[in-house]
């Protein structure tokens, strides 16, 4: 079973659709149906027609028995609002939740692909390199970018300690827009 967090959101729902196109339906889909500032009707529309084995609210995941049976993690879930100012909310959703998933990937020896953000680069004054020594030089311009940067830095700390899943990938998304985001157009 493949875990997809943020499965009702823009990127997560398109990922699940692509997995479905590949014939993969044994998916544990996780999201916040009533996430702060999001219209539930939009997520319901994004989920329409998708095939998955089980849906869980984000806070239910860690106590569900299926969590111990997953074979891969696509972590696309987060508070993605660049205008969010609630630092505790961002820490809980974008850093701490991600750390638990990362540790689970290591424990189960499964791959993890997670959504980072170009917001981690800040103004771009330091460039856009993902060389490990450069990442610590970046200064995000908003709390959202800072939360994503903090998780990236934590991952690098785990790498230095040799405490990572065998395969893990952080994807830096740049100002994404497309199908399932029409409400923002």
Q: Which residues does each PLM region occupy?
A:
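N-terminal Rossmann NAD(P)H-binding glycine-rich loop of SDR-like oxidoreductase domains
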Residues: 2-24
């Amino acid at each position: 079973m493949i875990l997809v967090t943020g499965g009702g959101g823009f990127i997560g729902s398109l990922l699940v659709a692509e997995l479905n196109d590949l014939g993969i339906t044994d998916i544990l889909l996780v999201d916040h149906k009533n996430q702060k500032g999001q219209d539930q009707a939009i997520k319901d529309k994004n989920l329409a027609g998708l095939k998955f084995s089980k849906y869980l609210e984000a806070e239910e995941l860690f106590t569900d028995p299926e969590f111990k049976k997953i074979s891969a993690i696509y972590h696309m879930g987060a508070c993605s609002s660049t205008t969010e100012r609630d630092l505790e909310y961002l820490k809980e959703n974008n850093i701490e939740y991600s750390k638990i998933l990362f540790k689970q990937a290591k424990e189960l020896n499964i791959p993890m692909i997670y959504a980072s953000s170009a917001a981690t680069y800040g103004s771009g004054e330091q460039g856009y390199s993902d060389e490990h020594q450069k990442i610590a030089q970046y200064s995000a311009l908003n709390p959202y970018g800072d939360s994503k940067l903090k998780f990236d830095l934590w991952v690098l700390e785990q790498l230095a300690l040799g405490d990572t899943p065998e395969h893990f990938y952080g994807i830096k998304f740049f100002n994404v827009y497309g199908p399932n985001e029409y409400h923002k157009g």
